[in-house]
């Protein structure tokens, strides 16, 4: 059977035009072969240089302009945010995910990759379909994921690629009853 489905994300242009272009390309390529491509809008992957000191303005752009246009064009299923200290805060992430949900996008979170930021707990609070990475997830985060059926998406290749030694606690997730998915991050 092999690979049947691949998730593809935007999040590398970090402006409206580039984000929409990435999602349109995913949609067009999806029409041309048998592997299902699932598009995820990830305008909240990082802050572009022009918003270095204007984070609130970039979050406004995502919520007030990008997400409504993604919905209008019907070019994504999921909405993902990189919720981590130094990136998007819990409050910014909550706003972006709730806005996405109002526009028909299913929430997901890049959570607790470098330290426990409370993002796994937020994944539970926002009823996200999944929380990705989770190398520094807390017990409270695991509990919130259990209570809200959040899938733990583990990406061991990221740990290896970054030269880190800490992997997501697979055995804790399985013992706790959290559904686990494995992904490559590529």
Language-model features: locations:
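Metal-coordinating catalytic core of metallo-dependent amide/deamination hydrolases
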Residues: 4-117
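Active-site-adjacent C-terminal substructures of enzyme catalytic domains
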Residues: 106, 116-186
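Short intrinsically disordered, low-complexity coil segments enriched in acidic
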Residues: 1-6, 127
């Amino acid at each position: 059977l092999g690979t049947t489905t691949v998730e593809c994300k935007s999040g590398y242009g970090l402006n409206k035009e580039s984000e929409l272009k990435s999602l349109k390309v995913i949609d067009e390529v999806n029409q041309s072969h048998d592997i299902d491509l699932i598009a995820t809008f990830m305008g909240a992957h990082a802050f572009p240089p022009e918003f270095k000191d204007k984070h609130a303005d970039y979050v406004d752009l995502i919520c007030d302009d990008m997400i409504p246009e993604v919905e209008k064009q019907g070019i994504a299923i999921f909405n993902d945010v990189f919720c981590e200290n130094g990136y998007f805060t819990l409050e910014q992430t909550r706003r972006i995910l709730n806005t996405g949900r109002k526009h028909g996008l299913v929430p997901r979170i890049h959570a607790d990759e470098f330290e426990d930021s409370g993002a796994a707990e937020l994944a539970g609070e926002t009823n996200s379909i999944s929380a990705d990475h989770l190398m520094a997830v807390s017990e409270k985060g695991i509990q919130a994921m259990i209570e809200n059926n959040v899938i733990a998406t583990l990406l061991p290749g990221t740990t290896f690629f970054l030269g880190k030694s800490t992997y997501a606690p697979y055995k804790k997730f399985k013992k706790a009853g959290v559904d686990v998915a494995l992904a490559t991050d590529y």
